[in-house]
Amino acid sequence: MNFQRMTDLNLAGKRVLIREDLNVPVKNGVITSDARLRAALPTIKAALEKGAAVMVFSHLGRPVEGEPKPEQSLAPVAAYLTEALGQEVKLFTDYLDGVEVEAGQVVLLENVRFNPGEKKNNPELAQKYAALCDVFVMDAFGTAHRAEASTEGVARFAPVAAAGPLLAAELDALGRAMQTPEKPMVAIVAGSKVSTKLDVLNSLSGICDQLIVGGGIANTFLAAAGYNVGKSLYEADLVETAKQIAAKVSVPLPTDVVVADASQINFEDFLGSLAAAQAVIKKVEDVTANDMILDVGPETAKAFANILTTSKTILWNGPVGVFEVDQFGEGTKALSLAVAQSDAFSIAGGGDTLAAIDKYNVADQIGYISTGGGAFLEFVEGKTLPAVAVLLERA
């Protein structure tokens, strides 16, 4: 993908406006997870080292536009950045008519979603953002799938628009997996419903050599192959769709599964009741009417791990079982370790996937971990991300 990169630009003495994703969880004024802030720091530091006058902006939460509330302010983020950067990072609440910032200095602009017209990508607002800077840097991959004034609009009107290091790394990794994958390529797509991942499955079926499915998605494919899935979560209306996908790409199905007796499960307290449920390993052909499939069995996990070992590119989205409960997490654990130990280029994304990577402590062995969530899925679906499209146009 051809786009301008912040790292290639001369920023000395330039006013640089950086769109980061600083949408961190804040409870009673305290940031409870700083992962996104830690991810953004290298970009801010790089702009400072290049001699720029740096303005950073972001959204936080879902405020009503034009109705700022203190609990949705970026004030805790300004305090965090002040400490992390070793210089005062002032928070500007009134910035649309201009901001005073010197070269080598960083300021933070208040929550963009306080500004009427932000979410609707109002061109007048986008032009006001653009007028603040000489260079606009888009570095928030997690919001790149939304055409908003601070993501797509400003990039149209700024004198120069470039991708920051975080966004560039994300696009490079996704491009490597989706556009020029080294073969053989294997994708792991798991989740509760085929319907929510249908575009992902269709897109990947045209790219990868093997498609490993897990969770409720696998149950729908098992039902399509004529197996009884008992009380397991599956979508009867998508059995034909599963057959069509399986006709396009190799979908290795589980040969054994881990089940629980559905009568022992309280669906109001699903994970709590599962913790007390007995896990039973069964061949897929032995699943009975009252069984609920909650993981792949050890034989299947080993077979899937062997597929991953011989692949050159792995894209992973979703755990193959209810890994939050240990007795139904062995399949996800085995696949996590197989991805980690494979020599393939691996990219992983999606909230549950990241939680599994954390649980099994394999983050350092995954080629690239996408922080994008919805943006990651839309890219994998083959959709154009508006904030990326404008950078490509302006390159």
Curated annotation (Swiss-Prot):
Location of this chain's protein in the cell: Cytoplasm
PROSITE patterns, alphabetized: PGLYCERATE_KINASE (PS00111)
Position of the signal peptide: none
Binding residues annotated for ATP, in chain numbering: 197, 324, 350-353
A cellular-component GO term for this protein: cytosol
Annotated positions binding substrate: 21-23, 36, 59-62, 113, 146
Enzyme Commission (EC) number: 2.7.2.3
Catalyzed reactions: (2R)-3-phosphoglycerate + ATP = (2R)-3-phospho-glyceroyl phosphate + ADP
Keyword entries, A-Z: ATP-binding, Cytoplasm, Glycolysis, Kinase, Nucleotide-binding, Transferase
Gene3D superfamilies xref list: Phosphoglycerate kinase, N-terminal domain (3.40.50.1260)
Pathway: Carbohydrate degradation; glycolysis; pyruvate from D-glyceraldehyde 3-phosphate: step 2/5
GO biological process: gluconeogenesis; glycolytic process
Keyword ATP-binding: yes
An annotated Gene Ontology molecular function: phosphoglycerate kinase activity
Classification via InterPro entries: Phosphoglycerate_kinase, Phosphoglycerate_kinase_CS, Phosphoglycerate_kinase_N, Phosphoglycerate_kinase_sf
Assembly information from the UniProt record: Monomer.
Family, per entry: Belongs to the phosphoglycerate kinase family.
The protein's name in its UniProt record: Phosphoglycerate kinase
Organism (species): Acinetobacter baumannii (strain AYE)
